[in-house]
Design a protein with these regions (language model features):
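Membrane-proximal basic amphipathic "stem/tether" segments
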Residues: 139-172
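A structural motif corresponding to the C-terminal lobe/cap of the Radical SAM core domain
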Residues: 1-152
């Protein structure tokens, strides 16, 4: 059918964060088995991950990047938790006095707009940037590429990621 790539919202690997985010559907998922199955079908994976959840700590960035590389996730999009207006998350954070900005242009998943619990706002922003730079480092691109079972998938991963790497100046 021509399916070459799939966007998967992993969100977080923390059961506590999944529960507090009402992402109960993710709790019983075997991510590793799903990734292996998709790779066996030749499907590349764009993994999406969220940082800044209430149970995150300073090590969440390294753990997330390491997991993505270990399981040969082709591309990753990292996000800072963003409590969009009109959502339950925003309403709860507003009730708790945690909203720090009402400048809607900052609600972009790259900017911290609330009082974090497990990390400082600066740690969250720095960790988010670290995750991008490390996931897309040449050493990790090669490492993830060679995690595939066959040369065709290894080369596809390597060339696809190399293409992403050339756009790095635009997100720095």
């Amino acid at each position: 059918a021509g399916l070459r790539s799939l966007f998967l919202g992993f969100e977080t690997f923390s059961p506590d964060n999944l529960r507090s985010s009402n992402k109960l559907q993710n709790l019983s998922k075997d991510y590793v088995a799903a990734v292996k199955r998709l790779h066996s079908l030749g499907i590349m994976i764009n993994g999406s991950f969220v940082f800044g959840l209430d149970h995150d700590d300073k090590d969440v960035f390294r753990r997330t990047v390491d997991w993505g590389i270990e399981h040969s996730i082709t591309t990753a999009t990292f996000h800072i938790l963003t409590p969009y207006p009109g959502t339950r998350l925003f309403q709860q954070m507003e009730r708790d006095g945690r909203i720090t900005s009402y400048d809607w242009s900052q609600y972009d998943t790259r900017t911290v707009v609330y009082k974090t619990l497990g990390l400082t706002a600066e740690e969250l922003k720095q960790g988010y940037e670290w995750a991008y730079h490390n996931f897309y480092s040449w050493s990790n691109i090669f490492k993830a590429s060679f995690g595939h079972d066959n040369i065709k998938q290894q080369l596809a991963h390597l060339f696809y990621m190399g293409g992403w790497k050339k756009f790095e100046p635009f997100w720095n």
